[in-house]
Amino acid sequence: AQKLNYINDGDDSTDEDLGCNEIWLMPISPSPTYHKYDVTDYMDIDPQYGTMEDFDALIEDCHSRGIHVIIDFVMNHSSSEHPWFVAASDYLKTLDADEEPDLEVCPYVDYYHFSREKLEGYTALPGSDWYYEARFWEGMPDLNLKSEAVRKEFDEITSFWLDHGVDGFRLDAVTSYETGQPDEITEELTWFNDMVKAKKSDAYIVGEAWTNRKSYAPFYASGVDSFFDFSFADSNGNIAKILHGAGSAADFAQSQINAETLYQSYNPNYINAPFYTNHDMARSSGFYSGELALQQTKYALAMNLLMQGNAFL
C-alpha cells in the first residue's frame, strides 16, 4: 500500500504522489525464465510474484486509488514447456515419415506452426523429423493465431483476467504475429480487440509494434486503442534529439503533428502511447553526459509526459 500511495494515493488534494492512473504489469504468469515472456500457464500467477489472492488484493487496492491495471499479454508464442506444445511435440514424435498429423487425435498440433521442411524462422524438434516456428528462440514456439482453437483459448484466458478485474492488455511482439504480413496482423488485432471489448467495452489495449511509424500506423485500423510510439523513444529518438541539439522545438512539434495526422487516418479515436524508454532499452540516465545530464533527463521526461495520449513512464 505504501508504494501504491507513491504512485497515486487517491487524494487529489495531495502532491506527494506521482498521480499515475495506470499500472502495466509485465508478464506475471508461470514461466521458466527470468523475463517470463514464455508462459507455461496463462491462467495463474508465477509463485515468484505471489498468489492469485495477492493479485486480487492488488487490483482492489489499485482501483480504490483510481489506478487502472493492464497486464502484459503474450500470445505470439508460449513456452516450449507449455502443456499445449509438449502434447503436440510428443504426438509428432510418434508419426512415421510419411504419416500426417490427425488433429482429432492431437488438436494441439494446430496450435503451433509445424513443418517437415526447414523454413525460415523454424527450428528442429528434437527426436523427430519436424520443425517448428520459433522466431525469438527455441524455447518460445510461435502460436498459430489463425487457429480457431487457439482463439477460443485466448477468449477464455482474457475472460479469466477480466473477471479478476484487469482493465486491459498490453500486446507483446505484435509485428511477429505474422512475420512480414501486416494485413494478416491487422486481422488478428481486429479479432482480439473485438473479442475483448465485447466483454468489456472500456478495456484499454496497447500494442508493442517495434518498427517505424509508417509500418505500424495501419494497425490502428484494427480498433486497438494505442501502439507504443517508438519514434520518440530511446537515445536517438525525437525527444533525445532535441536535448542533444540535433533538432529544434519546431521539429519536435511537427513530428507530433505528423504522427497525429497519420494515426487519425486509420482510426479517428486512436490514443497515442508515447514513452521515453522501456525494459528492452538502455536506462535513460545514460542518454546524456556532463554537468547538464540530470537536467536534460528531467526535460526529456517532462516532454514525454506533455505529449498527446497516454504517456508511459
Whereabouts are the PLM-identified features?
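A Trp-anchored, charged/polar loop motif used as the substrate-binding/catalytic surface
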Residues: 1, 148-157, 248-261
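Short, charged, surface-exposed secondary-structure boundary motifs
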Residues: 236-243
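Hydrophobic residues within beta-strands of alpha/beta enzymes
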Residues: 23-25, 169-171, 312
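Active-site groove signature of glycoside hydrolases
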Residues: 75-77, 155-180, 269-281
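Catalytic-core region of carbohydrate-active enzymes that cleave or remodel glycosidic bonds
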Residues: 190-205, 244-313
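Acidic/aromatic-lined carbohydrate-recognition and catalytic surfaces
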Residues: 1-152, 163, 174-222, 227, ...
